[in-house]
Amino acid sequence: MPELPEVETTRRILEPYLLGQRIQKLLHQDPARYRHTERAEGRKVLGISRRGKYLILQLDQGLEAIIHLGMTGGFRFEPHRHTRVTLVLPQQTLYYTDPRRFGKWWVVEAGDYREIGLLGRMGPEPLSPDFTPVGFKQALAQTRRKIKEVLLSQEAVAGVGNIYADESLWLSKIHPERPAHTLSPAEVKRLHRAIREVMGQAVEAGGSTLSDESYQQPNGEPGYFQFAHKAYDRTGQPCRRRGCKGRIVKMVVGGRGTHFCPVCQQNSR
């Protein structure tokens, strides 16, 4: 958390407040975590985009501000007890909050991502035309890692984190420990379709909010996709697939808590 749907929701809400505005001050007390931010002061925001889980502010004079929200990062329109960065604009002040302090900021020359290596090797956006079944199949065929680990790596497809990997694997009936290269063409197509469906629905629902200190939209509203979860955070509850008698179990895959139905997501190869 936050993953692509939460970051995209944040981008859409912030865009009208940021676009065309000049950053007057960018205040914080952690230069090791929020790097080179003094370079953004006095710069106009020409655009706000997203790549995977990263927000990217295009600034004038060839700079970009890259923001990774970490596990608990987000923006607010009012001061918050966990405010870490204050972004002062001519007619608005935005407050970046992060209770667990895992988020990071960088201000870099546009396209210079040497400090942010993942941006340079990230896979296609799941809701873009670049994310194709053929390309996805080629990426999975090249690795013996477990499919859940591959999805989390961001290299086969961008922006899929723990929640939406579990949801996509549930929807496609694929066990999270299946070696990626063993997926059949039909399974790859199902997973490709599931990722697009889950991500699209989650974006429209404003993402998922799991607790009071987890992701919220900048206006203070929660996301609502958690009410549609089929696997994530449903340990011990009945599987929601029609006709399935299983219950959701939790295990660890790639160091991450992983939720799935052992009845309809069997580890057959």
Predicted region positions:
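A short, charged helix-loop
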Residues: 103-145
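Generic structural signal for hydrophobic residues
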Residues: 10, 14, 136, 164-165
